[in-house]
């Protein structure tokens, strides 16, 4: 089980920083044996062990180092809140975080997430990749371009949306909303194989 936060989880802590709030949830979730990510990456290695690469590590490592870390990964999950820095209609100015963060901080957090995402895109191709965010891609990415064969899972809008043509996969179709009493789980399929030579160019070695 992998958890991320949404804007509602920030409401009750107006005097705390995002890092403080994140750590409150992280401690509770991880104490109970589950996974939590905020601007971080989880990957399942060839031995089915769950590994995490922290935000500072993602920023520190170059692409070659990250590729080496993920070379034998069967599944990659990158994500976090995402934030709504690129949404001019529904953002911090409309109170979606209440008093916890303002529009300026929201934009900076969006940029922070987008920088990590852009850095990861070329590294995590062909890795059975899930991009797990609360906000949809258009809110946290300047370019609304979905990567081929990535699975994008998000919520926030309270409007269900599903698209899957086996190349582009966007799953925002299990949003509960405010008054839905019919809560259920959904699932999707990912291959569990990995290609250790995916970063090699065609040729003889």
Where are the model-predicted features located?
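Core catalytic region of metal-dependent phosphoesterases/phosphodiesterases
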Residues: 1-70, 144-146, 167, 173-175
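Conserved beta-sheet core of the metallophosphoesterase superfamily
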Residues: 2-4, 31-32, 74, 136-205
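Gly/Ser/Thr-rich helix-start
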Residues: 7, 80, 156
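Short catalytic/ligand-binding loop motif for oxyanion handling, primarily in non-cytosolic enzymes
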Residues: 11-13, 44-47, 85-88, 139-140, ...
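Short, low-complexity, polar/charged sequence segments that are solvent-exposed and flexible
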Residues: 21-24, 95-100, 189-193
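Secondary-structure boundary motif
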Residues: 30, 122-126, 147
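Active-site-proximal loop/helix segment associated with metal-binding centers of metalloenzymes
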Residues: 48-130
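Short beta-strand segments
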Residues: 132-134
């Amino acid at each position: 089980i992998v958890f991320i936060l949404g804007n509602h989880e920030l409401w009750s802590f107006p005097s705390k920083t995002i890092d403080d709030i994140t750590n409150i949830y992280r401690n509770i979730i991880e104490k109970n044996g589950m996974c939590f990510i905020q601007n971080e990456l989880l990957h399942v290695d060839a031995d089915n062990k769950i590994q995490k690469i922290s935000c500072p590590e993602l920023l520190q490592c170059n692409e070659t180092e990250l590729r080496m870390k993920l070379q034998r990964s069967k599944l990659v999950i990158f994500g976090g809140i995402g934030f709504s820095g690129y949404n001019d209609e529904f953002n911090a100015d409309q109170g979606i975080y209440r008093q916890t963060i303002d529009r300026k901080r929201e934009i900076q957090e969006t940029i922070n997430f987008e920088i990590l995402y852009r850095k990861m895109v070329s590294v995590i191709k062909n890795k059975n990749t899930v991009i797990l965010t609360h906000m949809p891609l258009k809110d946290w990415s300047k370019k609304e371009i979905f990567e081929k064969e990535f699975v994008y899972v998000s919520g926030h809008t309270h409007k269900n949306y599903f698209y899957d043509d086996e190349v582009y996969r966007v799953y925002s179709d299990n949003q509960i909303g405010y008054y839905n009493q019919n809560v259920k789980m959904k699932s999707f399929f990912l291959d569990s194989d990995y290609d250790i030579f995916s970063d090699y160019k065609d040729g003889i070695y």
